[in-house]
Amino acid sequence: CIETALLALLSDAELNQRFLPWLEQRRELLAEADPRFAEAAADLKVQLQAAADQFRACGGNLLPRFRALQQAGVLDLITCAATHGYLPLLRDTPEAVHAQLVTAVRQHQRLLGERPLGIWLPECAYYEGLDRLMARCGLRYSLLDGHGLLHALPRPRYGVYAPICSPAGVAFFGRDNESTLPVWSASQGYPGDGVYREFHRDLGWDLPEERLEEAGIRSRRPLGLKLHRVTAQ
């Protein structure tokens, strides 16, 4: 899924011009990390350099790469509601829901060359009748949380292991709850395992504020520089 907002960012010439300097700034800040984390910092520097090399190789524009993969049949790129609007909250204003869908479809086609066939509904949230608006925009399939299918009436014969078709002809795939658990669970999944990086700890919280200001960063915030592993806490 490539959301409409992300498409707009990826197509913005100024942001593309600022990306390589942004990567270089992060590499420079990594040089000031605590020496205890030198190995993690060095590994992250290599990753940032690889990202810079790839960005240069595609001419500073990622969209043609995505477009080529889609046209080759390697990817089936889908969209999302234009501003990630939570559609059940907008159901009393069908015009607003339609605007979310049609804007997303048009922007996807304009920037990627093809109309999307599928959509990732924000928060996998569905309400009765939404499928008619989706079909009107040419959207043929989407995905729901497992209970979105398991609590359907009638209950699907194969549960989440086969798509169901709505009255408007839109197919819905269910997300397997058991497969979701390892990804999201802090107690049983990847987020709680010590071999994975701690998402919430960031070099932006650890460097002196004066150094951040020298780099043009006016306030403490995450910089995308994660050097700590997950602990048992």
What are these regions (language model features)?
Residues 24-91, 153-233:
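Active-site cores of enzymes that catalyze phosphoryl transfer or operate on phosphate-rich substrates
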Residues 6-27, 190-194:
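Aromatic- and acidic-residue-enriched segments that line the glycan-binding/catalytic groove
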Residues 140-152:
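His/Asp/Glu-enriched short active-site or ligand-binding loop at hydrolase and phosphoryl-transfer sites
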Residues 94-121, 233:
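CE4/NodB-like, metal-dependent polysaccharide N-deacetylase domain
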Residues 1-4, 81-83, 118-127:
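Short, solvent-exposed turn/loop segments enriched in Gly/Ser/Thr/Pro and often Arg
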Residues 63-67, 98-105, 131:
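Generic structural signal for well-ordered alpha-helices
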Residues 120-124, 144-146, 173-175:
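Short His-Asn-centered micro-motif
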Residues 110, 125, 130-140, 155-157, ...:
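Hydrophobic, small-residue-rich alpha-helical packing segments that form membrane-like cores
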